[in-house]
């Protein structure tokens, strides 16, 4: 089953808020701007009380799905279960994502408050895995995957778990090893086309150049970009993306760019920030926004004109 054929719950939802509860990641992946350290890796953790206020405001505005990640690794937050529990207890659909290359103390305590979990890998053996996932250990990933399997089998957690295998020209031959490894598991194994090419990025870095191809035809520093990687409708216009400082950013795809902050989520008006998003010249170059506007019902278009679209 391909990534795009796997129409899971998270992608079918439109009322999503994405919150980076930590501004950092332990991995140095060659196809990720965070991993490449194109932007700072501060490891700043969002204060729990700030997070609760953000969740409350988002809930009041109708958001019922929350992803505790954008460009950060949520499992590095020591009290992650408290963040999950707060949103879960409000009745929100809680999503997590991780490289899983770490020791996790209370996996059950975290995942009992989660509804969906992504685990991202790029190999089955350490030799292949470490090409893209620099600084990560595949044995730790498998250890955590085995724990989840046991918890699922014992009925101690009920979380839709998806292992996403980022496929490149050098590693697709190991995808079937994960399929075999999890053939009797409740965990879904999905092949997802990888962004860019880690070997090209490594070459560019060696030449002192910035590898930008990982993101389709992105032009950095506020220039227009064309997303040719994803070819399906994505509700980025409706999605709220919040960084670890509590600021709302234009788009989750470039949430790391401070120049694209459109307001403070708690202090500023939601409708005014959404208006900025809809009027953004940057977004005019993104086909996902155009497709989104094209499929809106007339009533929703009227709401946009009234600045009441969230």
Give the ranges of each region predicted by the language model:
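Accessory C-terminal segments flanking Radical SAM cores
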Residues: 2-20, 187-310
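Intrinsically disordered, low-complexity Ser/Thr/Pro-rich tracts
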Residues: 133, 147, 158, 229, ...
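Short, exposed beta-strand "edge-strand" segments with a Pro/Gly-rich flavor and a Y/T-containing core
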Residues: 40-46, 117-123, 259-268
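Alpha-helix N-cap/loop-to-helix initiation residues
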Residues: 76, 103, 170-171, 258, ...
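Conserved C-terminal portion of the radical SAM core fold
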Residues: 20, 61-69, 88-95, 112-123, ...
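Conserved alpha-helical substructure of the radical SAM core
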Residues: 1-116, 127, 131-135, 139, ...
């Amino acid at each position: 089953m391909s990534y795009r054929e796997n129409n899971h719950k998270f992608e079918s939802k439109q009322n999503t808020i994405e919150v980076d509860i930590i501004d950092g990641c332990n991995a140095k992946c060659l196809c990720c701007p965070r991993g490449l350290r194109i932007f700072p890796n501060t490891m700043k953790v969002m204060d729990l009380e700030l997070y609760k206020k953000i969740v409350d405001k988002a809930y009041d505005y109708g958001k019922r799905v929350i992803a505790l990640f954008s460009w950060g690794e949520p499992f590095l937050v020591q009290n992650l279960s408290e963040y999950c529990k707060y949103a879960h207890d409000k009745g929100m659909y809680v999503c997590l994502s991780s490289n899983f290359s770490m020791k996790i103390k209370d996996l059950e305590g975290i995942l009992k408050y989660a509804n969906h979990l992504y685990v991202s890998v790029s190999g089955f053996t350490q030799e292949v895995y470490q090409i893209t996932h620099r600084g990560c250990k595949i044995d730790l990933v498998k250890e955590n995957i085995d724990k989840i399997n046991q918890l699922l089998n014992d009925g101690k957690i009920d979380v839709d778990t998806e292992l996403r295998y980022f496929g490149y020209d050098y590693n697709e031959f190991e995808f079937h090893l994960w399929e075999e490894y999890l053939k009797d598991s409740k965990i879904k194994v999905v092949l997802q086309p990888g962004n860019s090419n880690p070997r090209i990025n490594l070459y560019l870095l060696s030449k002192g150049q910035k590898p930008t191809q990982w993101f389709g035809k992105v032009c950095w520093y506020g220039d227009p970009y064309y997303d040719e990687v994803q070819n399906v409708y994505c509700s980025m216009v409706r999605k709220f993306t919040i960084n670890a400082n509590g600021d709302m950013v234009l788009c989750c795809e470039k949430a790391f760019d401070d120049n694209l902050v459109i307001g403070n989520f708690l202090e500023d008006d939601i409708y005014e920030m959404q208006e900025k998003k809809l009027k953004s010249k940057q977004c005019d170059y993104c086909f996902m926004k155009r497709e989104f506007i094209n499929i809106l019902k007339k009533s929703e278009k009227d709401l946009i004109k009234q600045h009441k679209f969230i």
